[in-house]
Amino acid sequence: MSEHNPAGAPGASTEVRVAIVGVGNCASSLVQGIEYYQNADDTSTVPGLMHVRFGPYHVRDVKFVAAFDVDAKKVGVDLSDAIFTSENNTIKIADVPPTNVVVQRGPTLDGIGKYYTDTIELSDVPPVDVVQALTEAKTDVLVSYLPVGSEEADKFYAQCAINARVAFVNALPVFIASDPVWAKKFADARVPIVGDDIKSQVGATITHRVMAKLFEDRGVQLDRTMQLNVGGNMDFLNMLERERVQSKKISKTQAVTSNVHREFNTKDIHIGPSDHVGWLDDRKWAYVRLEGRGFGDVPLNLEYKLEVWDSPNSAGVIIDAVRAAKIAKDRGIGGPVIPASSYLMKSPPQQLPDEIARAQLEEFIIDTK
């Protein structure tokens, strides 16, 4: 990492000015959550937050300054209304007052798959100059919430972040922070990136990862495992297009296998999205099974089902990723922010055991070197 200045040094702002790409359910939960936790007591443990105050930044210090989408029902609309329109169907946790942030038309590129095309109407407004929009909004952090499979679009916005000198949080499974070429681009530009592919607070990936490690730590040979996921949001509808989902399967699989020493045959591990069930709305149901052998090679099997609201589950992690990116920007750090990426993302540049990644993140928060 490059040399840096301590957070809170002269020139570091008291706000975290955030722009969002993709005003879907995840963006909705994040925007609502900032409102929900405005008055959270930073001297107490607050349900739903790992850190009320992350370094110098309270949750309420996050301010939304720009948003980009391609949906005709969202472009030209105040962010506070856009998060509740079109196909967004996550649970409502807060009323959001007008933000005075109007959703702008971003470029489409490969951001819309065939199921999106059949479901939403694309805005006929010409795309804006994203770099100029980020600069004019004095953006600190750009969060990419593009649909799974948006390889070209995600890299376009990553380059915009570099050009605008804006920190980048890559919430989807397009490999940017974990790609050495892209990592060097961010490092050379002294622009921080936290990525790739956001973990949930307690989701299928983190629970599966922990249980696989538990088997290993307790001397149980994990022979085979699977994770099947169904949900009712646009993310799951989009992932019915299997050509768009390969990076997601890779990301979820390596998040589990990287936490154990065992090498799996391809047929012995299956992890990925399975189907779209419309009436689930933004809920996700995960079915996980681990099959192993314990003492005397006696079979030992574990099967569980996890039910979550998908988008709030990720918002509880992205709120820390955003503030970590801002601290890195304050300190002049360029390139992947390893402590935040390793703990908060499924496919970071460096996979670490969760307890080590968490300890490094806490050290990063208080680091004043």
From Swiss-Prot:
Signal peptide: none annotated. InterPro entries: MIPS, Myo-inos-1-P_Synthase, Myo-inos-1-P_Synthase_actino, Myo-inos-1-P_Synthase_GAPDH, NAD(P)-bd_dom_sf. It holds the Pfam family Inos-1-P_synth. One of its GO terms (biological process) is inositol biosynthetic process. Belongs to the myo-inositol 1-phosphate synthase family. It comes from Mycobacterium leprae (strain TN). This is Uncharacterized protein ML0396/ML2692. PANTHER family: INOSITOL-3-PHOSPHATE SYNTHASE. GO terms for molecular function: inositol-3-phosphate synthase activity. It comes from the Bacteria. SUPFAM superfamilies: Glyceraldehyde-3-phosphate dehydrogenase-like, C-terminal domain, NAD(P)-binding Rossmann-fold domains.
